[in-house]
Amino acid sequence: MEVIKITPRGYCHGVVGAIQLVRRVARDPNVPRPIYVLGQIVHNRHVVEEMEALGVITLDGEDRLSLLEKIDAGTVIFTAHGVSPAVKIRAREKGLYVVDATCPDVTRTHELIAELVSRGYEVIYIGKKGHPEPEGAVGVAPGHVHLVERAEDLEALSFAPGQKLAVTNQTTLSQWDTQALMEQVKARWPQTEIYNEICLATQQRQEAVARMAPEADLVIVVGDRRSNNSNRLVQVAQELAAREAHLVDSVEEIDPAWLKGKRKVAVTSGASTPTHITRAVIEFLEKYNVEVEER
């Protein structure tokens, strides 16, 4: 099987920084115990399992403020997705030792929102509902940041004539979908200022898939199902490159039926996918003998 290794792929700088920070904290005997992560440090179960092996406890499943109430003492780590100011304030009130692993790109978006709202803007924020990154961003200025996921959500919004408006977004969305939605916002409210915050790593990975996937018969994206950026890579392969594409968490999830009749398979991975997981997928495919397997 010929494998096209799409590059860039895998870890982005924000994920690398977050993982390295947790490792350092876990190995530091001076850091108060127990050590908690408020949500998954990044959306990948393999990374979460590594953190748990280091003695770090992952709290997941609710909004960040609710999760925080489960912690009475010790250390709390904020994930790469960022948290709202209310979460930071509550952590200090509880006397917790705080470690902030927020991606610098997310921090920049929070600062942008705060600055815009301080100047009298209402902010339309394009993001995935239920994802922790929009939760933190909307929490920067509750009541002034309006979360929309699709065009239909715009129908519920109304602003006073002359209201200053800005639109920005979650960093890991499809850049094409985001641009299309921003154009719809601009068409409805022409005074809207546009601030596209798709991070460079997301852009580069999506553009690489759009460029290289057409050379393949099949695209496999290695990533966690909760990883928004991984899911967007599948979307790009299917919608822009018009290729069959599948998301797998590990090599064990590859269905041989996908490979039947295929000669070239392109492989990429999400920004939170460990390198060794992707390497195992590539090695499996390179050794896969289509003729033998199809007999």
Swiss-Prot record:
<feature type="binding site">
    <location>
        <position position="199"/>
    </location>
    <ligand>
        <name>[4Fe-4S] cluster</name>
    </ligand>
</feature>
<dbReference type="GO" id="GO:0051539">
    <property type="term" value="F:4 iron, 4 sulfur cluster binding"/>
</dbReference>
<dbReference type="InterPro" id="IPR003451">
    <property type="entry name" value="LytB/IspH"/>
</dbReference>
<protein>
    <recommendedName>
        <fullName>4-hydroxy-3-methylbut-2-enyl diphosphate reductase</fullName>
        <ecNumber>1.17.7.4</ecNumber>
    </recommendedName>
</protein>
<feature type="binding site">
    <location>
        <position position="43"/>
    </location>
    <ligand>
        <name>(2E)-4-hydroxy-3-methylbut-2-enyl diphosphate</name>
    </ligand>
</feature>
<feature type="binding site">
    <location>
        <position position="43"/>
    </location>
    <ligand>
        <name>dimethylallyl diphosphate</name>
    </ligand>
</feature>
<feature type="binding site">
    <location>
        <position position="81"/>
    </location>
    <ligand>
        <name>dimethylallyl diphosphate</name>
    </ligand>
</feature>
<feature type="binding site">
    <location>
        <position position="229"/>
    </location>
    <ligand>
        <name>(2E)-4-hydroxy-3-methylbut-2-enyl diphosphate</name>
    </ligand>
</feature>
<feature type="binding site">
    <location>
        <position position="103"/>
    </location>
    <ligand>
        <name>[4Fe-4S] cluster</name>
    </ligand>
</feature>
<dbReference type="GO" id="GO:0051745">
    <property type="term" value="F:4-hydroxy-3-methylbut-2-enyl diphosphate reductase activity"/>
</dbReference>
<comment type="similarity">
    <text>Belongs to the IspH family.</text>
</comment>
<dbReference type="GO" id="GO:0019288">
    <property type="term" value="P:isopentenyl diphosphate biosynthetic process, methylerythritol 4-phosphate pathway"/>
</dbReference>
<keyword id="KW-0479">Metal-binding</keyword>
<dbReference type="GO" id="GO:0050992">
    <property type="term" value="P:dimethylallyl diphosphate biosynthetic process"/>
</dbReference>
<feature type="binding site">
    <location>
        <position position="227"/>
    </location>
    <ligand>
        <name>dimethylallyl diphosphate</name>
    </ligand>
</feature>
<feature type="binding site">
    <location>
        <position position="43"/>
    </location>
    <ligand>
        <name>isopentenyl diphosphate</name>
    </ligand>
</feature>
<keyword id="KW-0560">Oxidoreductase</keyword>
<feature type="binding site">
    <location>
        <position position="272"/>
    </location>
    <ligand>
        <name>isopentenyl diphosphate</name>
    </ligand>
</feature>
<feature type="binding site">
    <location>
        <position position="272"/>
    </location>
    <ligand>
        <name>(2E)-4-hydroxy-3-methylbut-2-enyl diphosphate</name>
    </ligand>
</feature>
<feature type="binding site">
    <location>
        <position position="81"/>
    </location>
    <ligand>
        <name>(2E)-4-hydroxy-3-methylbut-2-enyl diphosphate</name>
    </ligand>
</feature>
<feature type="binding site">
    <location>
        <position position="227"/>
    </location>
    <ligand>
        <name>isopentenyl diphosphate</name>
    </ligand>
</feature>
<comment type="function">
    <text>Catalyzes the conversion of 1-hydroxy-2-methyl-2-(E)-butenyl 4-diphosphate (HMBPP) into a mixture of isopentenyl diphosphate (IPP) and dimethylallyl diphosphate (DMAPP). Acts in the terminal step of the DOXP/MEP pathway for isoprenoid precursor biosynthesis.</text>
</comment>
<keyword id="KW-0004">4Fe-4S</keyword>
<dbReference type="Pfam" id="PF02401">
    <property type="entry name" value="LYTB"/>
</dbReference>
<dbReference type="GO" id="GO:0016114">
    <property type="term" value="P:terpenoid biosynthetic process"/>
</dbReference>
<dbReference type="GO" id="GO:0046872">
    <property type="term" value="F:metal ion binding"/>
</dbReference>
<feature type="binding site">
    <location>
        <position position="131"/>
    </location>
    <ligand>
        <name>isopentenyl diphosphate</name>
    </ligand>
</feature>
<keyword id="KW-0414">Isoprene biosynthesis</keyword>
<keyword id="KW-0411">Iron-sulfur</keyword>
<comment type="pathway">
    <text>Isoprenoid biosynthesis; dimethylallyl diphosphate biosynthesis; dimethylallyl diphosphate from (2E)-4-hydroxy-3-methylbutenyl diphosphate: step 1/1.</text>
</comment>
<feature type="binding site">
    <location>
        <position position="171"/>
    </location>
    <ligand>
        <name>(2E)-4-hydroxy-3-methylbut-2-enyl diphosphate</name>
    </ligand>
</feature>
<feature type="binding site">
    <location>
        <position position="131"/>
    </location>
    <ligand>
        <name>dimethylallyl diphosphate</name>
    </ligand>
</feature>
<keyword id="KW-0408">Iron</keyword>
<feature type="binding site">
    <location>
        <position position="131"/>
    </location>
    <ligand>
        <name>(2E)-4-hydroxy-3-methylbut-2-enyl diphosphate</name>
    </ligand>
</feature>
<feature type="binding site">
    <location>
        <position position="272"/>
    </location>
    <ligand>
        <name>dimethylallyl diphosphate</name>
    </ligand>
</feature>
<feature type="binding site">
    <location>
        <position position="12"/>
    </location>
    <ligand>
        <name>[4Fe-4S] cluster</name>
    </ligand>
</feature>
<feature type="binding site">
    <location>
        <position position="229"/>
    </location>
    <ligand>
        <name>dimethylallyl diphosphate</name>
    </ligand>
</feature>
<feature type="binding site">
    <location>
        <position position="227"/>
    </location>
    <ligand>
        <name>(2E)-4-hydroxy-3-methylbut-2-enyl diphosphate</name>
    </ligand>
</feature>
<feature type="binding site">
    <location>
        <position position="81"/>
    </location>
    <ligand>
        <name>isopentenyl diphosphate</name>
    </ligand>
</feature>
<feature type="active site" description="Proton donor">
    <location>
        <position position="133"/>
    </location>
</feature>
<comment type="pathway">
    <text>Isoprenoid biosynthesis; isopentenyl diphosphate biosynthesis via DXP pathway; isopentenyl diphosphate from 1-deoxy-D-xylulose 5-phosphate: step 6/6.</text>
</comment>
<feature type="binding site">
    <location>
        <position position="229"/>
    </location>
    <ligand>
        <name>isopentenyl diphosphate</name>
    </ligand>
</feature>
